[in-house]
Amino acid sequence: SPTNNFATFNPLVNVLNNPTLSEGNLKTTYAASNLWNGSFGTMSVSSGKYYWELLGSGSGYFAGLFLDDGTVNYAASPYTYAQVGMVMIYGEGGSNMSRIDNNDVSGKLFGGTLAGDVIGVAVDMDNGTLAAYNNNVLKFTMDMTASGHWGAPMIPAHMQHSYSGSSSTYNFGQDSSFAGNKTAQGNQDGNDIGDFYYTPPSGFLALCTKNLPSVDVIPSEHFNTVLYTGNNVSGRGITNVGFRPDFTWI
């Protein structure tokens, strides 16, 4: 059985014109021209420091984090900056690299990104910062707490407005060749885990199960039996379950 699992994109949560996922759910290919496409990760984070990479495309994309608590409308365009819970880097091929900060990206340009550039995302959930790298050069560090778009848990997200057939490929530590599009570099995090194109910043780890905090699974917090006697009254509430159930069998 697997001893470690890395984050990927979740094929069950694709929205906004449903991009096609391939290469182990790390490559997102966009089917519709001039329409937004969105992909969202399989692992959320509430604490710790994590790093992942994106093989940059030549067209506009957003890469970063969404709140994973139902706050963000996944089906809305990322241009709706007023959405609380969205922290994103904006990259536009050959034009600019910006950040969403206080619902605005205007005036925050950090140089162009080109197809083939490796974009690094370093997320510090303990201190509320997101750092963006272009080919291992730090472009900016964003204070997510000041932006009003930060919270926990948060989930990796990618959105793109592009031409039909364009794609982006991610690496959460599985494959620094980006599915054969680069020469693998074999860099690891501080726990000697992962295969990154560039060495993660000090203290930042691959987003994988080995690097996530251990979780105590307590059966009574996930399953319970409640006995009651029917009284032929509609609208009756059955209480004392101990948690909010997702599935009830009567």
Residue ranges of predicted features:
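PRY/SPRY (B30.2) beta-sandwich protein-interaction domains
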Residues: S1-I250
